[in-house]
Amino acid sequence: MEFGRQLKTLLKKNLLLKGKSKCSICCEIVFPIVIIGVLFAILALIKVTNSDYNSIDVTTFSRRVGPENKLLYGSEGSLNNDQSGVIETMKEQVATARGLTVAEVQDFFMEINDRTLMESFFKNYSMMVYGGVWFNSSTNGGGGGNNNDPIAAGGQFGYNIRLDSDDTADTSETGKVDGGDSSIYLNDNFASIQVAMDQAIFGYFGLDMVLNISGRHYPDPYTELWQEWITGRDAIIKSAGSVFITAALMMFSFRLVTDVVIEKETKIVEAMRMMSLNSLAYFSSWIITSLITSLPVTLLIVVIFKGSQLIYSTSWGIVIITFVLYLITLLLLSFIFSIFFNNSKFCGLLSFVIVIAINICGIFVSKNEFSVSVKLLLSIFSPIAFSNSIYIMSVKDLTMILNLNWDYIVTENQSILMLGIDIIIYIILIWYFEKVIPGEYGTKEKFYFLFTKNYWFGKKRSIGEIDDIESTFDSEDVETIPLKVLKNSTISIRNLRKEFETGDGLRVAVNDLYLDMFEDQIHALLGPNGCGKSTTIGMLTGLISPTSGSAFIRGYDITSQMSKIRPYIGCCLQTDIIWSQLTVLEHLVIYASLKGVEGRNIQREAERMATEVGLAEKMNAPAGSLSGGQKRKLCLGIAFIGRSKIIFLDEVTSGMDPVSRRQVWDFLLKYKKGKTIILTTHYLEEADYLGDRIAIISQGKLRCDGTSLFLKNRFGQGYLLTCNKKLENASNGFNTNQVSEFIKNFIPGASILTDSGAELSYRLPTESLSNFPQFFTEFDLNLSKFSIQTYGISVTSLEEVFISLGQEDSKKLNNNANGNNEFNKQNEMESLKLAIATPSDGINQIQQFKGLLIKRIQQSKKDARSFFLSIILPMALIIGSIILYKSMNDQKQVLFYNNSTQPLTMSLSIYTDSDNTINVPMQLLNNELEWSNLFNNSPYFNKFKYINESINFNDYLIDNYKLSIGAINFTNQPISIDDNNNGQSTNCSYIAYYNSDYIHSFPIHVNLINDALLRKFKNISISVTSMPFDHILTAFEISSSDINASAIIYFVFILMAGFSLMAGSFAGSIAQERTNRVKRLLYVSGCKKHIYWLSNLVWDFFFAFIISILSCSILAGVIKGAFKEQFGSFLLCLILLSCAIIPLGYLMSYKFQTYGKAVGAITAILFVFGLVFTIASLNVRIQAVVNQNSTTQKVADIIDLIFSIISPIFALNRIVFILSGFPGSTRLGTFKVDNYWSFDYLGTPLIVLAGHAVLWNVWILLLDYVPQIKGFFKNPKNLPAPSPPQDEDYDVSQERRRLLNMRPSEEPIQFKNLHKLFPGSGKNPSKTAVYNSTLGIPRGQTFGLLGLNGGGKSTTLSMLSGEIVPSSGEISINGYDVITNREKALGNISMVFQFDALISLLSAREHLWLFSRIKGIKESQIENCVEAFIKMVDLTRIANSGCGGYSGGNKRKVSLSMAMLGNPSVCFLDEISCGCDAVVRRQLWDVISELGKDKSIILTSHSMSEVEALCSRITIMKEGKYTCLNTIQGVKNRFGAGYSIDVKFKKEYLETGIQTILQSIPNCTVLDQHDVMASFEVPNPPGNPIKLSNIFSILSNLPILDDYNVGQTSLESVFLKLTGANHDQRINLYD
């Protein structure tokens, strides 16, 4: 039940993901078919031409012989009388047939009675020789003595026919040969001479008979189609067919392993496991999903192989079962591979290579005589089992031509059995490896877990048992838990520890943590960035394996019983673990099903949860289109949906606006009953409000734990006074000492807690409480004097506790360091000023180039696997191809002609002596009784088998194919026989059938019949022998005599694969930087676009050129000929190729989002195009050569040009074929290349390659300038924007009027009528992200851009930074139009994206060095500047570790530091402090405050305290529109004049607390209320002012409050008022 539901859900998920990637589906279907198509194209090159089953008449000798086509004849010394008589008879017959005299035909013949001279003449004048006849020294087989004695009865007349060895069949072979049969005797002159000689012998010996002989191909028992594949089946399929099929099927495995590893890499699969995912359901779902596309394609491949009869003898059922089982094993192997990969970069390609390598080994195993048991044992590797299958399928169709030892061959059934066993083994291995192989994420079992009792039976423990065996933790900073409560803890952490190896050495992330958590409670985990909070959650959820210690969740041990724990877990990790393609509703439906919601309730539950978390309007929106806060809401819904009892929320409200945060608070309080919720947050008011217990972790250790009240009592020291400085005086002119002295006059024990940005806070001791009224009265009167804008007072806050503990721990750390790195405000400010004051010396393109090159060097050093994939593996492939070429070239060459000159007598004995079953079927017309008399003198009479004319001769021959080498069919009335044995007929016509499996069948059968006839009537036999001349090599054959075509083809294909892989690997890095927005950040930081591309091109070209030079040098050193002579040409070819395919790969990478998919797809595309085009070109060129057809060659030239223009890889192949002298590479009629640089040879492909190089390099260099170029033709400022809203705020309208006639140079940041409309798609309507906004920001102003999630803030910044083109409107930065003059407009800005754009392999120090060079800081100043920034943001401890391992807050520090480098004039900071703890936030505030003195800054934030501390002017966006625009005080005065009060009620006063406050404070109104928390507003009208001190006195005397904060109206109150309309109903409850 559970398994079935999860399987159904996961199948739906996989199909949704697959369906949203139609390009990938097309590739999955097309690529396998293309690979099989390539195989058939290769087979087509070597297929046997369709046999001609029509009768072919023997060429009439008399019509072909002539003075320019002479017949040579002779015998050693001289001819005897019989020999001369036969020749003279032949001459007479020719003369009679031609109507000439004998004298006139004498010139048709030439007598040469010296064998050597005859051969010499033929060698020199072969073009004018029809053939030769060489007589034996004695033709008297009857025992005559003298050479001139006539042949006696029973004697033999013998002769040898001499032709060029290539014009006759191979006399060294008797059986089947590749591509040859007896038709060569008919098509060339042998049969013509044989029949003419026999006719002359008949005439000379007085047998008046005219021979009319035809030849016909023996009807095979197979179809003609079957015959076509014999050569290809033997040469290709038997040896390499399984490789092609495996490569085709591995396309599905490639996609599968990549998808699975991506889900593993992005923590998605582990997140699903945390929430009770069944691993079997997960793997099964992917198998089924893959089979949906792969199974039809596999069956199509089966249909192709069986339909084409390439596989003929093996039944359909066996082939289908074999292919399908093999496909399943490949998919299962994908899962096994995925377990060993943590990075999707390499998994697909390496899996492909491994399987192909095993398959090649399988070919070796299947072809060699290993015992069947050994082959079956090796078949546990399914590629080897499949090689055995393809081998047996092939050889079963080749039994006619192969003699096989079946004792060493694995049968199809045995292979099927092994594939079935493999499936079982692989499933077991997947289950085992998935449990024991340690990955980057997830906890693993010990390798011997099968033998442990706990695995099979498990055991829950009580807290008492746990504490009996574990150490305990005791501290006065931990609130005591009653034993009764402690025994019911749901989570018990005991000495939990986690260590990491980093670039700075061993780092202890969690240091022996000891903690308990309970049901119905929210336990808040607090701590500075990098203290171990997320690591702790990772260990508790099974995402990370602990180094030591353990934890028990509901009594189960996380180190050994995680599978028992996970059904209870719901999780929202720090990073958003979602599928960007799926919608909100699809996510919730999937997880609802996974977590046990009943099927009929799933849709309703998912919709309800989407509504509950505030995503009702986004249900059908893809998750990738959500804002950061909306993604967190989705993750929250995922964590809570279903049956989860233990909920982990890691910074769940990070990136949320205040309204959304409060919605989440309500949600958590509503659903915490029956659950244990573990919450981490950097919003301390959130922890204070939600946390039933609060634990603070510092440096991996538990610092304190207890209720909020306990912590405040334990660490608080009274009250907190928070002052907001006037922004114009916050950095300059504000006298903190003066304020401090004033306060201490009234409250002597007061001390400064924080002084960051515009915020100044003091700790006021409780013992001075009686002095507060007088102090506040005087303080109110002196606010203007002290340049204080507003202030507030609260009892000890959790933030004060946090900061206090942080300062305390910092002091301890500094004391341990002997004070060498003393951290204090003065040193911090010195570092800050030094860092920010280091100016840019102006953009230096050489310096940028240097920085980017160093970046590539550092990445290569730290990512050895990528370096291997990009450089070492391609180089190995290329060098390997050269070695293979050399080794194959040194082997015996495969000749394109027959060079056998061994004499062979055309006698049936050459076959019958070895096989007594051979017979000669014969059919005569109407003379059934006389046929035996006709042939009874033949020595092979017993081999003749008469076939009655009533029997279909063709059918009989098919049925008895294996029993005869040929047959005879008389087509006229056979000769009548009289008692004197005198032939009465003058005509004898018959068809000699020849079996293609016996190459000499035709002349043997002609001799058999003619010999029998002569024996019958004259008692003389005929012996004919083939005695070939040495082959006269053509110029083509001479030029290709040293060529091994197979070696060249293999060389070209592997060389092509090496360069394709190189280009794909380089492009993968580009895709990754684009997806991670590193490239965008470089551009925004001032990096010249062409410098970015040039640096990558130069780095990649450098290694490509090294590979090219090595390849050329090795090739020239080991291969003689053109590769050495044309070293420069080939080197130029490889250099131009590299210059073409590398930028082409860059361009192709824009279609891919991940490194792995980019590498695999680009490599495959380049290789497949090159392969297909090469095979097509070779086919046409070989046809041109074979047929000597100049028109076909011209067509080939045109095709090659087109292919070269499409594929630079093909141009490489064309050049290699020319330089290697591959047949067909030269022009017809010439066999040597006179000028390699001519357009007929290297000229054209080199020019095309140069064109490719120029085109793709120019394209890639200009690509990023396209928006700017478009801007010249279609500038958004010329497009109409919608009219401003009629109810537009007055201040917003005033700003619009202010900027109406302002020159662009007057203020650094200006945008007018800025509008962005995103068009709709599918169920998602179009959305206006920014609505006709106008704003100007002068120098020295920090502007706060506030709003709800999805309100348009990030879209605005993206338009300002040039990343998104506006729908309409005008933007100018530093006086330059962003659209038309983008480079100058963005030349001196900096930006921090909402999501950190960092290179995970590089450290913080390396990032800062890189961006220092990008921004033009002098080299001599970089080191001091970088170190100052590192010290300023407190990253010294981890500065050398890769940023990929940093906490969210530390990543923000790095991002801000990079943005601040070079003293930029304009800064865009998008949620800069998101994920930062309170201490870090204040550090960042100091930086931004210092930076903002003379710069224009736009800041987005969801922390209103941050905005008040930093911003001098703000706007609040709602639905893309500005709801207000003024200074903070101006906004407060308009929308919230008076005081704001935030209180936390004691739980027992929850019901009456609101009314008590309303009654105690006149005119007080409720703004917001959540459980025990409430916000109030108290007006302060000028005519009847209320003193803050009075309100404070009232609150301090109310016993109903746990905590309170009172001050002038807060910005958060205004924000809630302007954006929180959905809170009206709750507020109205108290009206």
Curated annotation (Swiss-Prot):
Residue numbers binding ATP 2: G1347, L1348, N1349, G1350, G1351, G1352, K1353, S1354
Tell me which SUPFAM superfamilies the record gives. P-loop containing nucleoside triphosphate hydrolases
Name where it mostly resides. membrane
Q: Which GO terms describe its molecular function?
A: ABC-type transporter activity; ATP binding; ATP hydrolysis activity; ATPase-coupled transmembrane transporter activity; lipid transporter activity
Query: Per its UniProt record, what Pfam families does this chain match?
Result: ABC2_membrane_3, ABC_tran
Of the GO CC terms on this record, one is: membrane
Where, by residue number, does ATP 1 bind?
Answer: G527, P528, N529, G530, C531, G532, K533, S534
Question: Domain ABC transporter: where?
Answer: 491-724, 1309-1544
| Membership in a protein family | Belongs to the ABC transporter superfamily. ABCA family.
**What protein name is recorded for this chain?**
ABC transporter A family member 6
User: Source taxonomy lineage?
Assistant: Eukaryota, Amoebozoa, Evosea, Eumycetozoa, Dictyostelia
